[in-house]
Amino acid sequence: MTSPTPTRRISSSSHATIKPALKVAILLLLAFSVLVALGPGPSDLAGASPDPDPAPGAAVGAAAGDGYSCNPLGTATCALPWPSNFATHADGVSPTGLRLNVSDALFSPELNAHLPGASRPSAIYDGTSGFSPMGPIMFEVPAALDRESIQARDSVVVFNARTGERVAIQAQHDALAYDDEVSTNVVKVWPRVTFQWGERYVAIITDGLKQTDGQPVPHEMKLVNALFGDPNAPLTKWARARQAEVAKAGIDPARIRQMTDFTVRDQAETAAPIKGIIDEIWSGDVPIRINAVHDLHGVAEMDYAIEGEMLTWQLRAPGGVMDLNRREPLWLKFDLMVPTAARHRQVPVYISGHSLTLDRNQARASWGSLATEGFAVIAIDQPHHGSRVREDLGDLTSFQATERFPWLISAGGQSLVDHLRLLRAVETTVSQIDRTGPSGTSDGKPDMDGSRTSYEGVSLGAVVGMPFVFAAPTLDAAITTVGAAGWIYSVANSMLVEVIHADKIANSAVNGSEAALLIGTAQHASDVVDVPAFADMIRRARADSGRQLRLLLNHSWGDQVVYWYGGERASVLAGVPYVGPGAPPAGSIITKTTGDASGGWAATGYRDAYGDWMGPTLNGLMPHVSFVNPGIAKIVGEFRHRFVSENW
């Protein structure tokens, strides 16, 4: 797993007084000069980058045999930098022309010993057409970093190799690597939105990234050696081609310290499993069982409540591994409230997604207000919550060992399929319930209209619920508050990661770099059930009615519980305009658009109204509770009311 990084010895004499770092910089400039002299002329170079080997990993042997485990330009942890097209081989039927070929030796024996086979690298990566559109990219550096320099615009650069366009990124000193028992220095890079499907990217660390002593991070000597290697050698060809692409993108190649390139997997291939599940679910009815009915006597305009169960599929094999082909029956408890409005008309149905540590009973707090607006309300428990804790072998605070790694990954996918089946149950079986009418008793007509459905998720319900909002083919409206696009991203970036012990998932890693790599692998495994896979579905009109989803996304700037970058990512992927209140803060990737939040497609953002005087913990926590902000409550209420009065 780990090996010392070899360095190239450059002989010196009593006359040589040039500092090593300066010497390397000069050599890199010379190498680039030779590349330009022997290759295309400057005008040609400006118009087209060298045609790269479509599968450089196969060419250098990194992905041969049992698969990739070590980057030929690797650092002390030789799998890094990651991701890398060195882990690919050519495939004529792949939509990207590539397939990943990764060995379980990407992880140390110590880490693999705590993972089931289906959660090891080969099972997660092999055969996919590229890497995650969410990243993250990881570089390891040998010395402690100046944290502020990571935020500099030119310290870490990622650009599209085809267009040269730079990508908005979130570069960070990885907390897992820093806090690990055997700490390392890892720079982790997430896209602020996504890396585009099917595109190839080049990522570099430059001399803008500083160590704590103020000096630039050193050159990776394996890269220097490759640049000065045999010009016919595959690795040298790769290094020089990437160097030329860096120059074409407007960056001085002499500034490069480390470098990787990678191709993003294909969207259609990634989304296919869930799209197949959607077709399967919508091909029939979803059974329910009614266990108890409670007469609410019209209090707060509520007619009756039902405790019941819905049949879903347990997609988690023993050990928690997600298997989207699994169809083990699983009955989930639900609570349903039907308002008195159902005595006179079929009422729309509101699906409620609860917050972290709560359960389906959270919806009961809004029964009264939603009943007055004429909504029926239904809710189920999220994985690891409420009635599901025993089945899932613990709540979200139970992730205290690497053995729980599969459960963390599969929680998002299980929630997605559960809610797709709940929506279909509302359309086919729940909506057929008839227990009230003009006289307060059944009248032979269904009480609910299953074709008019809304979803509202708050906090956890707006994170694991976000893929459902994007993928659900017949949902009419959705409201999310302090949510995000990216389940693993949100876990990795939450200030609560230690509170729910998600950091202990990586306890069996041999060092901090491997711990970071494990979380990156979790993201790749989650792609098939994550928001980006369904970004092309959210604006599609319903086949049955032609209606489009109406969407309101509320996020809170400064939120460190559900990190606010994830909220902005969801807004951009959904293509919704930001309508206020106020102007976005510095660092935002969205701009304010004139409009009305109740117009159907909107994102709102709130700043922390409490100031910065409370200290880092409360400053990160208080923006998250913005869902109790009267301003947000007013916008949500207006948005919801207009759907009842104007659209339905």
Tell me the role of every PLM-derived stretch.
Residues 411-414, 473, 477-648:
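C-terminal subdomain of alpha/beta-hydrolase-fold enzymes, centered on the catalytic histidine
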Residues 440-492:
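Primarily recognizes the serine-hydrolase "nucleophile elbow" in alpha/beta-hydrolase
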Residues 1-20:
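N-terminal secretory signal peptides that target proteins for export/translocation
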Residues 51-293, 299-313:
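Acidic, low-complexity Ser/Thr/Gly/Pro-rich repeat segments typical of extracellular/periplasmic
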Residues 319-331, 343-438:
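Cap/lid segment of the alpha/beta-hydrolase catalytic domain
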Residues 292-343:
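N-terminal cap/lid segment of alpha/beta-hydrolase-fold proteins
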Residues 25-37:
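Bacterial N-terminal signal peptides
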Residues 37-51:
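Signal peptide processing junction and immediate N-terminal pro/mature segment
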